[in-house]
Every structure is written in C-alpha cells, then in structure tokens.
UniProtKB/Swiss-Prot annotation:
Pfam families, sorted: Cellulase (PF00150)
Gene behind the chain: MAN3
Tissues where this protein is expressed: Expressed in leaves, flowers, siliques and seeds.
Active site positions, chain numbering: E203 (proton donor), E323 (nucleophile)
Family affiliation: Belongs to the glycosyl hydrolase 5 (cellulase A) family.
Extent of the signal sequence: 1-19
Protein name: Mannan endo-1,4-beta-mannosidase 3
Lineage: Eukaryota, Viridiplantae, Streptophyta, Embryophyta, Tracheophyta
A GO cellular component entry from the record: apoplast
Gene3D superfamilies: Glycosidases (3.20.20.80)
Length: 414
C-alpha cells in the first residue's frame, strides 16, 4: 500500500509538472502516413501494439484524477505499447464534452487536451473517435434527439445518417475537434502528430438499410469532409468488420447471423478513397456464444486472416485490429483461455507484419488503472498486475518493435 501511494504521488507531481512547464514531445516523431499497405513513420514502416482507454478525457476533466492518465501511459511505455484509442466525444449527460449542438464544456475539452499532451510527452500515438454508434455517452441517439427538439421530423437513431441537420451537427463537431487549440501544447489538433488518426464512429451500424448503401454514402460524405478540414491525419471507419453484399461468401462464412442486418460492408466501406486504413474488431465469445472454445479460436484466426487477405489484395490498405479481448464472464472462463486468445491474435498480426503485410497492430480492450473500479468490466486489464496476459502483450510489442527497428526480440518468453 505504501508503494502504491508513492507511485500515485509521483504521478501527480509529474502531471503537475506537465501542466505548469508545458509539454515537449518525448521524441521527434512526425505524422504517421500511409504507403500502400503499410503505415510510415519517419521514413520507416510503422507497426505498433496498443490498447483502448476510452475514459481518458472523462478522468482528466478533474485535475485531481489526471494522475491516472499519467500512470496508465507510463505503464504502457514500460510494456512498449505505442498506440492508444480513445473517445473524442461525450454528447450530453454528466461531464459532457458537447453539452448541446456546437456548445462545449471547456473543462472537459481541457481533459482531452491533457490526455493528448501526456501521450505526446511519453511518445504514444492516438486514434480518436468522433462519435458513438450506441447511446452510451450520447452517440447517434443524442444527435437525433437534439434535432427532434428543434422540430425535425426524425424518429429513429438511423436518421443520423440522412437528416441534413443531424449531418451538419456531426460536421460541426468534426470541425471543432480538428481546430481545437490544445491548452497544454498550444498546437491545433489538426497539426498534432501525436494524433495518428481519426475514426468516423465507434462501430457504426444502420439497421434501417441492411444493404449497406446508406452507411456507405454517409461514410463517403463525412470522410471527404474530414479530409477537407484536416489533410494531415489518417482516417478510418471504426467498423467491426462485418461483411456485406459486396462479399457474399465472406458474409455467409464469417459473419454472425445477427450482423447481417447491421447495414455494414467491410469492403465497400473501406474502398472509399478518403478512408486510409481498415478497421476491424474481434469478439468471437460475444458473437458466437454457443460455440466451444476451440471453435471460437479457429473462427478468430479465420476472421483475422480473411480480413488481412482482403486488406492486401482488394483494399490495398493497412489494417488495425481496433478492439479485441476475452471476457472474464464467459462460461467456464480460465486465464489460459484469455492467454490463448491473445496469443492467437498476436501471432496472426505478427505473421502479416513480418512479411510486410497490411497488419499494423492490435489494440486490446481495455486498460484501466489500479482502483478504477467504476470502469472495471469483464474485458479490462491492469498492466501493473503483471499477469501472464500482460507478459504476452509485452512480448508482442517487442517483436513488432524489432520489425520497425526498435528494441530487441526476447530469446525466451517473459
């Protein structure tokens, strides 16, 4: 307990120093760009291991809890994790970023500023998502409700994709985000190389049009708009990766049946010119709960391999596995099962990366700090616990580091 208190105190002091003295980048890293199926950083192929931490801006809104961001980022660097994916939204509700259309809470925005500044200081790249598909933290539903309150004829969350006013709300949010001047670094978000890229939405879906045409049209319009206001950053969709009508065989063999009505199309959505890299997620335990563990592992490998094959041959773009994990509340769960999921995932990513393929990295869901019980769920991981899973994560980071010319490959398992 004394040791933990010391670590927390140290993190607080570091956070205060970052705020008081200004923030300097931990390295001279520039913007991540794309060349064919590879990401490029400072003239070299960029591969990275990473994690999700959706809560960064929320916790950093309160200056007394900002040490949690510092502590998690410091632990991430110990394990050679170099990308974090987080939310660039909180629409309405407690600690909202966007209180009403175009109206922002400065304190919450400064929380996101701090998270970006700390990532910059510690050499971590960020992928930031503009809005949520789900009603958690506002999402599409909140945008539609805002429009409805003005008298717009909207009745479904899927009106988000077609109503002109709602679409303008989204564009306004994008414009506000990219033009934000970070209060710590004094750099506009659109000029900040710490931000690796943006995502249009977290897990976009449109049940009103299972053909996928509505969602593809919306993505095309919004992707072009994002590029018109920020030409420096990469952009992806935030998709789970379910196949659509453009890939009928993949749709039949890989999608869970429930996904066929979600209106997404992995190929069509990512073939858009303004989309720079492919996004997929992987949760076989949630998608196929009735299968046994071995069958789910086989499906996991096939899911990744098929998407990587399509990224290479059809999309000709890099791919990031934006979310994956093993829920601890899965019936019969064991630590060995979670380790097997992480090993299978990382092995597939590494095999592609080693050959110069499109796999750029995997971001597990999700990291929390000690004592963050309000964010704990069946998928959360505390890096400081040094579990066997964390050891597997570290090994993958070091292997990818060897490919990009950093670090050394361990001769033995950690």
């Amino acid at each position: 307990m004394k040791c933990l208190c010391f670590v927390v105190l140290l993190a607080i002091l570091i956070a205060q120093n970052s705020s008081d003295l200004g923030v300097k980048s931990a390295s001279s890293d520039g913007f991540v760009s794309r060349k064919g199926v590879q990401f490029i950083l400072n003239g070299k192929p960029f591969y990275a291991n990473g994690f999700n931490a959706y809560w960064l801006a929320y916790e950093a809104t309160d200056s007394t809890t900002r040490f949690k961001i510092t502590y998690v980022f410091q632990n991430a660097t110990i394990h050679d994790l170099t990308i974090v994916r987080t939310w660039g939204f909180r629409d309405g509700g407690y600690r909202a970023l966007q209180i009403a259309p175009g109206v922002y809470d400065e304190k919450t925005f400064q929380g996101l500023d701090f998270a970006i500044a700390e990532a910059k200081r510690l050499g971590i790249k960020m992928i930031i998502t503009f809005v949520n598909n789900y009603s958690d933290f506002g999402g599409r539903k909140q945008y539609v409700d805002w429009a409805k309150n003005t008298g717009q004829n909207v009745s479904s969350d899927d009106d988000f994709y077609t109503n002109p006013l709602v679409k303008q709300y989204y564009k306004n949010h994008v414009k506000t985000m990219v033009n934000r001047v970070n209060t710590f670094t004094k750099v506009e978000y659109k000029d900040e190389p710490t931000i690796m890229g943006w995502e249009l939405m977290n897990e976009p879906q449109c049940r009103a049009d299972p053909s996928g045409k509505t969602l593809t049209a919306w993505m095309n319009e919004m992707a072009l708009y994002v590029k018109s206001v920020d030409s420096k950053h990469l952009l992806s969709t935030g998709l789970e990766g379910f196949y659509g009508d453009s890939s009928p065989q993949r749709k039949t063999s890989l999608n869970p049946v429930a996904a066929n009505v979600l209106g997404t199309d992995f190929i069509a959505n990512h073939k858009l010119d303004a989309i720079d890299f492919a996004s997929i997620h992987s949760y076989p335990d949630l998608w196929f709960p009735n299968l046994d563990e071995k069958s789910r592992l086989n499906l996991l490998r096939k899911w990744l391999e098929c998407h990587l094959e399509d990224a290479q041959n059809i999309l000709k773009k890099p791919l990031i596995l934006g979310e994956f994990g093993k829920p601890t509340n899965t019936p019969g769960y064991t630590q060995a099962q979670r380790d097997a999921v992480f090993n299978a995932t990382f092995d597939t990513i590494y095999e592609s990366a080693e050959k110069g393929g499109p796999a750029a990295g995997a971001l597990f869901w999700h990291v929390i700090s000690d004592g963050m019980n309000n964010f704990k769920d069946p998928l959360s991981i505390v890096l400081s616990e040094n579990s066997t899973t964390v050891n597997i994560i570290t090994e993958e980071s070091r292997k990818l580091g060897l490919i990009r010319g950093k670090g050394k490959l361990s001769k033995t398992k950690i």
